[in-house]
Amino acid sequence: MKSARTSRAWIKAHINDNFVRKANHEGYRSRAAYKLREIAEHDALFVPGMTVVDLGAVPGSWSQVALESVGPTGKVFALDMLDMQPLPGMTFIQGDFRENEVLAMLEAALGGKRADLVISDMSPNLTGIRVSDQAQGMYLAELALIFCREHLNPGKNFLVKVFQGSDFEAFRQMMQTDFSKVVIRKPKASRDRSKELYLLGLEKII
């Protein structure tokens, strides 16, 4: 039995390593690119020329996917607490999204215009304490949702990372008041042992 468990663990690790190798081969900054690509392809998230806001952007793989998808006529605004090497065609803002001053910087960069898609892969500094980590992650998700209420165009979409826990259902219902439909996504590149899920709000209600 122990051998079988070890074998299964090895197979899972091998599959996940494939995403790392694939990212290196294809020039993505992390394996997270394939999470967004899978969801985007399934739900047709991107349209050439659209404006995208990427929250929690470091190391930049989601912004890479967004830039490829929106093309030269599109715009990508990325924000994160950590610094990173900007990508060609991307506007990067470094700062804590929880701070009003940083939010004002993002609003200024948008120039009074609204986004056509908001994607958030924000994650708290994990402590290993499940209840605390889940609560902090949900708080970031709520802030991203609040941002969408003012800065996402009607009829457009919002993708956000959340962690399974006691607040998950309440947050999903909160999103349902702002979007015509809310669906759960667990892409293949998301590790099986991870508690992360992605909620996709489709067609923001005016």
Curated annotation (Swiss-Prot):
| Broad class of the protein's primary localization | cytoplasm
Catalytic activity field: uridine(2552) in 23S rRNA + S-adenosyl-L-methionine = 2'-O-methyluridine(2552) in 23S rRNA + S-adenosyl-L-homocysteine + H(+)
Q: Which GO terms describe its cellular component?
A: cytoplasm
Q: Record's SUPFAM superfamilies?
A: S-adenosyl-L-methionine-dependent methyltransferases
What are the protein's UniProt keywords? Cytoplasm, Methyltransferase, rRNA processing, S-adenosyl-L-methionine, Transferase
Q: Does the keyword Methyltransferase apply?
A: yes
Q: Which residues bind S-adenosyl-L-methionine?
A: G60, W62, D80, D96, D121
Keyword Glycoprotein in annotation: no
EC number assigned by the record: 2.1.1.166
Q: Which residues are catalytic? A: K161 (proton acceptor)
From the record, what ranges are coiled-coil? none
Which cellular compartments is it found in? Answer: Cytoplasm
Q: Which GO terms describe its molecular function?
A: rRNA (uridine-2'-O-)-methyltransferase activity
Physiological role: Specifically methylates the uridine in position 2552 of 23S rRNA at the 2'-O position of the ribose in the fully assembled 50S ribosomal subunit.
Under the heading HAMAP family, the entry gives:
RNA_methyltr_E (MF_01547)
UniProt xrefs under PANTHER family:
RIBOSOMAL RNA METHYLTRANSFERASE, RRNA METHYLTRANSFERASE 2, MITOCHONDRIAL
- Which family does the record claim for this protein? Belongs to the class I-like SAM-binding methyltransferase superfamily. RNA methyltransferase RlmE family.
What is the name attached to this protein's record?
Ribosomal RNA large subunit methyltransferase E
Ranked from the top, the taxonomy reads: Bacteria, Pseudomonadati, Pseudomonadota, Betaproteobacteria, Nitrosomonadales
